[in-house]
Amino acid sequence: MKKVLALVVAAAMGLSSAAFAADAVSTTQAPAATHSTAAKTTHHKKHHKAAAKPAAEQKAQAAKKHKKAEAKPAAAQKAQAAKKHKKVAAKPAAPQKAQAAKKHHKAAAKPAAQKAQAAKKHHKTTKHQAAKPTAQPAA
């Protein structure tokens, strides 16, 4: 893992040959010394390299990000906003009027049906009362 990081950092700086040489030296030193001292020496060397190199990479990335933010998303946002406003003004306004007209016609038709149902219920109650007294004396 440490070797991979060293290679990536070295490749970014353009010193791949120096990185390979540093890796070769660190691998040969590690078996000769104890693990703790080898880890410390290689660790310090990599920290110095990492501290020097990512600073240049970060500056380059920041410059790229600023250029992209100014160029592409600004134009895309304006186009999207224009599209949204056109859709809201054109399409939903006409269907809403048609739906409102349909709802009003249906509302006028429904109360008439309710009156008919109420009239039917009243007639049924009178028919049942008239039918019950005639059925009792016959039984």
From Swiss-Prot:
Residues 1-21 form the signal peptide. It is found in: Periplasm. The keyword Metal-binding does not apply. Keywords: Periplasm, Signal. It holds the Pfam family Asr. Proteolytic processing gives rise to the active protein. Residues 27-139 are annotated as: Disordered. GO terms for cellular component: periplasmic space. Residues 27-40, 52-61, 90-99 have a biased composition (Low complexity). Residues 41-51, 118-130 have a biased composition (Basic residues). Its main location: periplasm. It comes from the Bacteria. Residues 22-80 form a propeptide. NCBIfam families: acid_shock_Asr. Belongs to the Asr family. HAMAP family: Asr. Required for growth and/or survival at acidic conditions. This is Acid shock protein. The gene is asr.
